Swiss-Prot record:
This is Leucine--tRNA ligase. ATP binds at K652. The gene is leuS. Belongs to the class-I aminoacyl-tRNA synthetase family. It catalyses: tRNA(Leu) + L-leucine + ATP = L-leucyl-tRNA(Leu) + AMP + diphosphate. It is an enzyme of class 6 (ligase). Its EC number is 6.1.1.4. GO terms for biological process: leucyl-tRNA aminoacylation. It comes from Staphylothermus marinus (strain ATCC 43588 / DSM 3639 / JCM 9404 / F1). Its main location: cytoplasm. A motif ('HIGH' region) lies at residues 45-55. It holds the Pfam family Anticodon_1. Keywords: Aminoacyl-tRNA synthetase, ATP-binding, Cytoplasm, Ligase, Nucleotide-binding, Protein biosynthesis.
Length: 969
């Protein structure tokens, strides 16, 4: 069967079993008190567009674990819902409403993945002007895509975050947080969208999930402009301690600057900086009294807060949209400043353009103010020269800056004349001078982002102070300490290397805005003008999964879901009879919801991508700790890295995104699952490569053919008691044990490697050692276990093959295969490895012999040699070993042979030989004679060492346990 035909057949098999699973509702668990439960969740997807294979990696791993736990006898709940709140969906809807061609065409292409009729596509696009229609359309399509990938989801519990019943739940959550004093109101610096005029969170900012946006606190320092009354150029810095080494100011000649009257002074900043200042001081009045280009400032003189006179010079690296758009130069410790100064010194023509005397610039020299052990001279200059940087536009200057700052921050000491700062560490001096500048009104705090950022509608994001902003205060001491302690001591995080990042994120979190004036979502119950933002309303929704289906079953209305209902259901507070009377919810329904929650909670495993560590997962932990009793706190978090394609990050602009819909149409669910699970460890970026995918298709074809042939073919009666039979059964059960352990520890790639690929390699080897008929019989023997063990990763194909075996029950509901530990036999595995090593050794010798021999004697070591190894392992003295063996076995005159064994096993440990019965070794080589002959082209004879010596076979005495000597002739 050709690959294309095989994939078509496989897709039909997948559709068949998806339909059967859905028809029989086999993934809709009920409470079973006598059965252990397992509650696993993955993030509910944001439904503003189709999902791609990067999302698919996370969801597939979640499903593999859900299926595995089900086979292990757990009552598994694996639910799903859809996230629609926030501003991203509204932003898309608005752009479609404005008639933006680019976004309309993109969304038409998305719709066309599911709808083929052009007229229908136009209708759907038109409907997207209502954001809810857009959200619901993609929620339904994601549902389809998840079904097409075979996810074992309980869809009864589905909801979306815009539903009134969910709004009632979030309302209760925020009332609980307020009740505990964790929601506060005040002036707060946030990431703010100039387009929408409101705070924006990570979910609302382009690429913020993979490239986080952080607010940095600059110190804006005032430099008095000579010749002007009460006027200051303001330069912002992250390193105010370097003010002692300032040599000049930098401005961008072509940038626009403004003179602004503010707080009784005139300050000069870039036009872009003024907008930021106005938003960071919203109650202050700013009056523009002058405008100029940067070139008009070049050549002017200023006085620093330390009293030093400095000149203003031109620099192209200055970004008017970064901080104040003015930079003070400290070339001793700032690589950008050092390179710009060196360039300018060589460019007299440029200086002449601005009327600056080149001699003045040539006299400017870096001032060393920080001493770092091992650094002689100016730190920035040394690093720049080592890296070979000569241009202020060299992107490596970013790394050079990091190197200098890192070394100075941890090792640097101030060597300035000022006794107040002399001898301080860089970190101490930084804080001290900052406080002094602010106290003396020689500077102020300026907030800036760590990178350029835009909302999903294209609005520019800045740092702004919101007056009366509602925020969740993650800095509350008891809350933060409880979260850190729980993660550190109780919570399991896999891969374990991310535990530190998780703890760091919890430690770093402080006050975070939790509401805004715009967007889909739940109104803040105590201030309805505000809408709860999308990361804050998605922290404990796992609890809602436990009751969502019951709310629908009992036709409970949103207005009936008063806070006391959730108090009872989730916390056990209140009298259910009184609550029933007050809300009109039947008592039975309340008790059923309480029972359902108590059975399923806590979350046993939360699986997601590493991008969620700094936000969603931190909030997930914090909010559970705040609201629920300890017994209901989540037990485990597991994570995976991202997916790229052919070595490149996937992006719409590159056109290299593979959507989940493409998997269903062009590939296959089981192909995708096997590849995505087996291509990389969880903590490794997975690189989707088509050539590798092609190889996986071949492997699936081979697996199917192996199973089909074993089922369709009758075989004779075999006792399976040969060494090679024992080897295969040992190998299979060992792989099954290792794969089970791998799944228990979330080592998904190892599980796939062992249970799929390594078992097939073992089958190939067994076939080569025996015959096709014997191989078919052996596969029949292990096939049931093999299918069960592979069901989590390739559920459709294994269900199909299971049905070929005449099985009527769903394989997905079977029990995980029993490991036959008695069959695991180190001895036969070592013997088989020794046979393979012997064949390689013979081949290596054959390659250098001419003419080619036709026969081979294989000499198996005498049993006394094994005894020598035993004595070596016990640590016996060499002379004692020689004496004991010589006397016991009558080897007088053959002491050199004993010494040879001792020497060889001292060089290369022979410990494995202790696992081998010498008679079994002899029998195994004899049994393998035909195989060895086939692989080497030689006639094979096997002898005991003593027999070989009697026949005068050369080098017979050189044989060792598991390392037989051989003679070719």
């Amino acid at each position: 069967m050709k690959k294309r035909d095989f994939l078509e057949w496989l897709r039909s098999v997948e559709a068949k079993w998806q339909s059967k699973w859905m028809e029989k509702k086999i993934f809709e668990p009920r409470i079973e008190p006598d059965k252990p439960k397992y509650f696993i969740t993955v993030p509910y997807p944001y439904t503003n567009a189709p999902l791609h294979i990067g999302h698919g990696r996370t969801y597939t791993i979640g499903d593999i674990i859900a299926r595995y736990k089900r086979l292990r006898g757990y009552n598994v709940l694996f639910p799903m819902a859809f996230h629609i709140t926030g501003t991203p969906i509204i932003a898309i809807s608005e752009r479609i409403s404005r008639g933006e061609e680019e976004i309309i065409n993109r969304y038409k292409s998305y719709i066309a993945k599911y709808v083929k009729d052009p007229v229908e596509i136009e209708k759907i696009i038109e409907s997207f002007k209502d954001p809810l229609n857009l959200a619901v359309f993609f929620a339904e399509r994601v549902h389809m895509d998840f079904d097409a990938l075979g996810y074992s989801i309980d869809w009864r519990r589905r909801f979306h975050t815009g539903e009134p019943i969910y709004n009632a739940f979030v309302t209760w959550q925020f009332l609980k947080l307020r009740e505990k004093g964790l929601i506060k109101r005040g002036d707060h610096v946030v990431t703010y969208c100039l387009l929408h005029k409101q705070p924006e969170g990570e979910d609302d900012i382009q690429d913020a999930d993979v490239n986080p946006v952080e607010i940095l606190e600059f110190t804006a320092i005032k430099f008095k402009l000579l010749g002007e009354e009460n006027t200051y150029l303001v330069a912002a810095t992250l390193r105010p301690e370097t003010l002692f080494g300032a040599t000049n100011l930098w401005v961008k000649p072509d940038a626009d600057y403004v003179v602004v009257e503010w707080r009784g002074e005139n300050i000069i900043v870039s036009k872009e900086a003024l907008v930021k200042l106005q938003h960071q001081h919203p109650l202050d009045e700013f009056k523009v009294v002058g405008e100029m280009k940067g070139r008009e400032l070049v050549g002017k003189k200023v006085v620093s807060p330390l009293g030093n006179e400095l000149i203003v010079l031109p620099a192209d690296f200055v970004d008017p949209d970064n901080a104040t758009g003015i930079v003070y130069s400290e070339p001793s410790d700032a690589p950008y400043d050092y390179v710009a100064l060196m360039e300018l010194k060589k460019n007299s023509e440029k200086l002449a353009m601005y009327g600056v005397d080149p001699e003045v610039v040539k006299k400017i020299e870096p001032i060393k103010i920080i001493d770092v052990p091992g650094i002689k001279g100016h730190h920035a200059g040394i690093v720049v020269e080592e890296m070979g940087i000569s241009s202020q536009f060299d992107p490596r200057l970013v790394e050079a800056t990091k190197i200098v700052y890192r070394e100075q921050y941890y090792k640097g000491v101030m060597i300035v004349d000022d006794p107040e700062f002399k001898g301080l560490s860089v970190s101490e001096a930084k804080e001290k001078i900052k406080k002094k500048l602010l106290r003396e009104n020689k500077g102020f705090v300026f907030y800036e982002l760590n990178r350029k950022a835009y909302c999903r509608a294209g609005g520019k994001i800045i740092a702004a102070k919101i007056i009366g902003q509602w925020f969740i205060d993650y800095s509350v001491p008891w809350w933060k300490e409880e979260a850190k302690k729980y993660v550190s001591e109780k919570m399991r995080i896999i891969p374990v290397k991310y535990k530190k990042a998780m703890l760091d994120a919890i430690d770093w979190l402080e006050r975070r805005p939790c509401a805004r004036k715009r967007g889909l979502g739940t109104r803040l119950p105590f201030d309805p003008e505000w809408v709860i933002e999308s990361l804050s309303d998605s922290t404990i929704y796992m609890a809602f999964y436990t009751i969502a289906h019951l709310i629908r079953k009992h036709n409970i209305k949103p207005e009936q879901l008063k806070p006391q209902v959730f108090d009872y259901v989730f916390l056990g507070k209140g009298d259910p009879e009184e609550i029933s009377e007050d809300t009109g919810i039947p008592l039975k329904a309340l008790e059923e919801m309480r029972q359902e929650f108590n059975y399923w909670y806590p979350v046993d495993q939360r699986h997601t991508g590493i991008a969620h560590i700094s936000n969603h997962l931190s909030f997930f932990i914090y909010h559970h700790i705040a609201i629920f009793p300890r017994k209901h706190w989540p037990k485990m978090i597991t994570l995976n890295e991202m997916v790229i394609r052919e070595g490149t990050k996937m992006s719409k602009s590159k056109g290299n995104v593979i959507l989940l819909r493409d998997i269903a149409e062009k590939y296959s669910a089981d192909l995708f699952r096997l590849y995505i699970a087996g291509a990389a460890n969880l903590d490794t970026v997975l690189d989707w490569r088509e050539k590798e995918v092609e190889r996986v298709i071949d492997s699936l074809k081979k697996f199917t053919a192996i199973a089909e042939k074993a089922i369709r073919t009758k075989c004779g009666t075999y006792s399976h008691d040969k060494y090679i039979d024992k080897w295969f059964l040992s190998k299979f059960n060992r792989l099954l044990a290792e794969a089970t352990n791998a799944l228990d520890n979330m080592e998904i790639r190892d599980y796939v490697q062992k249970m799929f690929y390594d078992v097939m390699v073992s089958i190939d080897h067994y076939r080569e050692r025996t015959s096709n008929e014997e191989t078919i019989c052996m596969i029949k023997r292990i096939l049931s276990k093999w299918l069960k063990s592979l069901n989590p990763v390739i559920p459709h194909l294994t269900e199909e093959i299971w049905s070929w075996m005449g099985k009527e029950e769903f394989l997905s509901l079977e029990k995980w295969p029993e490991i036959d530990y008695k069959a695991i036999n180190e001895e036969v595995e070592y013997l088989e490895e020794a046979i393979e090593a012997l064949i390689e050794d013979i081949k290596n010798v054959l390659n250098i012999l001419s003419p080619k021999p036709k026969h081979a004697y294989i000499v198996v070591a005498s049993p006394w040699k094994r005894e020598v190894i035993e004595m070596i392992e016990k640590g016996m003295d060499r002379r004692e070993i020689i004496r004991t063996i010589r006397d016991k076995y009558g080897l007088k005159g053959r002491e050199k042979e004993i010494v040879y064994v001792i020497q060889e096993c001292s060089r290369t440990p022979c410990k494995r030989a202790l696992k081998i019965d010498p008679i079994h070794e002899y029998e195994a080589y004899n049994e393998a004679r035909q195989y060895i002959a086939k692989k080497t082209g030689l006639h094979i004879e096997v002898y005991w060492e003593e027999e070989a010596k009697a026949k005068n076979i050369p080098k017979a005495e050189k044989t060792l346990p598991l390392k037989p000597s051989f003679y070719l002739y």
